[in-house]
From Swiss-Prot:
Residues 146-352 form the ATP-grasp domain. It comes from Chloroherpeton thalassium (strain ATCC 35110 / GB-78). GO terms for cellular component: cytosol. This is D-alanine--D-alanine ligase. The keyword Cell membrane does not apply. The gene is ddl. Cell wall formation. HAMAP family: Dala_Dala_lig.
Amino acid sequence: MNKKKVALLFGGRSSEHEISVISARSIANALDKTKYKIQPIYITKAGKWLGAEASRKILAMDFESAIKSPTKKEIHLIEKEIVLLCQNSQFRFDFRTAKIDVAFPVLHGPYGEDGTVQGLLEMFDVAYVGSGVLASAITMDKAVAKICFEHAGLQVGEYLAFLRREFEENRGSVVARAEKKLRYPMFVKPANMGSSVGISKAHNRNELIEAIELALAYDRKFLIEKAINAREMEVAVLGNDEPIASAVGEVVPCNEFYDYDAKYVKGSSEVIIPAQISEAFAGKLKAAALNAFVAADCEGMARVDFLVEKETNEIYINEINSIPGFTSISMYPKLFAQVGISYTELINRLIELALERYSERKLRKI
């Protein structure tokens, strides 16, 4: 049996770099070795692509323990090792001559989850796992995604979106508009980041200004959202034109909200799968997740995050992650495991979906 060659793209020019490496390592370990052969391709924080030998060495590094270190000493040691590998590694790679059957981008955040790598793979004429250029770009930009969700009839929380220029030219006006429409407490987010990077909760004007300045360190666009007293629910979606939804999960954060530290560093947030809700209410969340998936033109996979108001049970869609995490604690594989789809089977299906979509595209007249 000829094994299909899978190019595993990981790392990348994003603040979610380490999470990408951890996700890729989990996928590499779970991949069905009887069907697939891995070609790892590591992308440095500077954007340099490394060959298979260096990439395998990086894939074996213990990033998971390193990011939990309070001193960050371990992560600095890993970064030094990577610098040495970069000095001795030359990347000369042609997807066609390498006979890559499918690429699996495990790149979280900008320059990987936003349509950039997807466009590159389209130009190379390579099948790849996950959403295409349009859906990746839509779901990466939280402001654009909210417009898409509202058009599809989904409820989003009250928010305002601003550009850096607006804040720099008249910060007083930005703050006044937020205070008038949203009132405290509020959340401030970069428009184009994931893993809750750059997100802050503001309880007063000084905190709001600080939160905006933090968000602008990551993006030229930011959102200010009205805080909702809510439970955090998540639904995973799998498929192309006929997607299916997973069980519903709930996250109970160890911090005031589910930020980067609560997700990956402290690791003490509680995950409840399935969520303790009625079957009828779970059905509403699943239907909303599928609606959002289709509205954004997603393919392959996505994790849809919701806020459920504690007193009224009103459902608000928060965001879609087109390349959800695949770490040992990530919700996406756990949610499908609850409905009988193992981690390895999930990866098999994602690769099959990518190849199906590629075959369908080759039939088009272009």
